[in-house]
Every structure is written in C-alpha cells, then in structure tokens.
Amino acid sequence: MSNKKIEQWEIERYWEIFSSLANGHPRLNSSQAASVLRNSRLSDDQLEKVWDLADVDGDGELDFEEFCVAMRLVFDLVNGELQAVPRVLPDWLVPETKAHLVQAGRALSDRPEQFERIEDEDDTPGLKDGFDWYMKPSDKSKYEEIYSANRNHRGEITFESLQGLYDSLDVPDTDIRSAWNLVNPSASLAINKDATLAFLHILNYRHEGFRIPRTIPASLRASFENNKIDYQIDNARPAQRWGADGDRETPTGRKAKFGDTYLSRLGVGGKGSYTPKGTDFSDTIQDEEWEKVRLRRELSELQAKLDAANKASEGRRDRPRNDGRPNWTLIKKEALQLLEYKERELRELREGTGRAKAGQDLERLREDIRTVGEQVEGLKSHLAQRKEVLADLRSQIEEERARR
C-alpha cells in the first residue's frame, strides 16, 4: 500500500485558493477552477483528464475534497512525480467520503471477483457435525464488533477487508472462500451486515472444528436481502439450539477463541475503539506557489540537460571552453540564484522587510515633508499678518510725532 497522502499543510493552502474562488459557494465550476489550474501550464488535454478524475461524483463541479485531488494531481505532474495523468484515481487520493462512488464506478467497468465454489466431496477427517445457525448473544456481540471495525461507508464488508481475521484463524483458505460464497450467492463485491454476521458465525464454528454447512436455509438466504435475520432463541428448534456449545474449549486447548486475537489487534472488544481514518478535509496555495513550482521544474529540466551534456562531453573535458557552447554549470548556478532571489522577495513581501520596508519608510518620509511644507506655509501667512500690524503701528507713531 502506498504511503502517499495529502498532508495537512497542503489542505490548508488548497483551502485558501478554493475559498477565494468559490465566494462562499460549496463548489467550483470549470470557469472558476480554470483560472488557477491553467497557471500550471499543463496542456488542456491533461487538465481535462485531471478534471474528469477529480470530479468523482460526476456533477460537473468540484467540491473542496475534489479540488484537493485535482490540485495534488496537477502538482505531481508539474513536479515530475507523475509522467502522465493516471487512467484511474490512485486509492490514496480517493476522498474517504466518496470511496463508495469510486468503488461503484469500478464495479461497472470491471466484473466483480467471483471465487470458485469449492465442493466438499470427501469430508475432511477430524471435523465434527452439529453446526448450529443460532448465535449466542456473546458471539453475536463479537461479530458486530468485527463488522463495525471493517465496514465501509455503505455499511458493507468486502472479502479483503477481513484478511487480518483470516490470518488469525485455524481455517483453510478454501473453507473461508466456501463460507463467503455461501452467504454471497449473487457474487457481489461486498455483503451487508446480516450476511456478514452469518459469514463470521460459519467461520467461528469452522475454527472450533465443525464442518461448514453446504446450504443456507431459504428463509435465512432471503433475509440477507431484507436485512431481517431472526436471532431470537425461541424461534430455533431445540435440537439445533443445543447442538453445540459455543463456550467449549477447542480440541487442542491452546487455540484462541474466534476473533479474540484479531479484535485485540484492532483495539476493540475491550476498552479500546477502532475508527477507520482517511484524508481529513475538514480543516487549506497562493499564486506565488506556482512560480516556485515552475522554477523548480525549469531547474529540473536544466539539470536533465546538464546530465545529457556531461554524458556527451565525456572524454573531452580537457578541451578549452572557447567553442561557444553553453556553460551548463553556470546556467544551473544562475537558475538557483534566481530561485533564491524570488523566494527572498516573497519572504520580504510577507514580512514587510527589505525593499518592501524601504518603500514604506520612503512613503512615511514623503508624508512628513508634506506636513512640514504645510506648516511653513502657515508660518509665512502668519508672518505677513504680523508685518502688516507692525507697519500700521509705525504709521500711527509717525502721525503722532507730526502733530507735536
């Protein structure tokens, strides 16, 4: 199984883009998403395939989970993690809430897995008769714990989801598949809860040394479709009710009880609990991130060209470098310096330092100069008024002197 996943920091960045494009709506249409997807400079054919993969529910729009899938596919293509758009969506990219849609789509394109029916022509020696369809309350509780720990979003169980249980049992693979075929006559990809409980009940008895029944009662088979299996003890025939004791020890006395080891490993059946985990989209890329990605892509292309040039120049390294050919080492160095310069500019813009800070200081200085200029004009006006008053006083003094 792949260890890849969409990290939380990616989800947060994708949310910033999604929320800015969606304007409060829960989905993006193709026009809204095109503005950011086309910045990747992928071809329209590639972007069309990415859209078709990400639009899991096929409604022609992308909700946030589907948008995260599309963005991750685009970044993997740009960064060279993917050489081409995959034909089907990788399992690790499938949103947990839409897994059933992907499974249904695959079921329509592929035939469901059907196991060969194993007919027990000669009974396995050492097995006992007396299989009882009645489920004791303690057994039923254990079956329900196993079911709850492995069910999908539709409340169904697939054959592969119980592989850990099969490994803990003393039951041959052929018998396990025979039991599955018995409770799954339609050869579906998954079975519902009632069929699962019956399947686990058969495995329990086989684990305890009882033969697997060859048929299922008609009423019980019908109840798999109606979800109404009758577990009432009063409805069971006395001969069947006491046909076997589910609490008896196993023949070896050392074999673990059915499902105990498996439930212990899952952390259920006691104080623990088990909850399947997938990518959590409940919790959020800026345009400059595309520039970083493009620069890294150009750098990788330059690196590839450099490697090709080095291979072509093997045996001629001592030749003087005056033939006009490009200096790939210098080109790589300049590309790295350009990347560092762009990242430093982005950092200064975010932090308000460097040239961004100098620009802010210059603006403040201009504002101060404007303020001082206004104050000077005010002082000049005040000085002119005082000069007029002084001239008037001098005129009055001269008139007094003339009178005397």
UniProtKB/Swiss-Prot annotation:
Region listing for Disordered, in residue ranges: 306-327
Keyword Coiled coil included in the entry's annotation: yes
Main location: membrane
Xref: Pfam families: EH, End3
EH domain location: 10-100, 139-227
Binding site for Ca(2+): D55, D57, D59, E61, E66
GO biological process entries: actin filament organization; endocytosis; endosomal transport
Bilayer disposition of the protein: Peripheral membrane protein
CDD domains assigned: EH (cd00052)
Any Gene Ontology CC annotation: endosome membrane
PROSITE patterns: EF_HAND_1 (PS00018), EF_HAND_2 (PS50222), EH (PS50031)
Disulfide feature: none
Composition-biased stretches (Basic and acidic residues): 313-324
UniProt-annotated location(s): Cell membrane; Endosome membrane; Cytoplasm, Cytoskeleton, Actin patch
Coiled coil: 281-404
Molecular function in Gene Ontology: actin binding; calcium ion binding
Entry keywords, A to Z: Actin-binding, Calcium, Cell membrane, Coiled coil, Cytoplasm, Cytoskeleton, Endocytosis, Endosome, Membrane, Metal-binding, Repeat
Residue span, EF-hand domain: 42-77
Quaternary structure (record): Component of the PAN1 actin cytoskeleton-regulatory complex.
Family under the similarity heading: Belongs to the END3 family.
Function comment: Component of the PAN1 actin cytoskeleton-regulatory complex required for the internalization of endosomes during actin-coupled endocytosis. The complex links the site of endocytosis to the cell membrane-associated actin cytoskeleton. Mediates uptake of external molecules and vacuolar degradation of plasma membrane proteins. Plays a role in the proper organization of the cell membrane-associated actin cytoskeleton and promotes its destabilization.
Protein known as: Actin cytoskeleton-regulatory complex protein end3
Organism: Neosartorya fischeri (strain ATCC 1020 / DSM 3700 / CBS 544.65 / FGSC A1164 / JCM 1740 / NRRL 181 / WB 181)
Encoding gene (name): end3
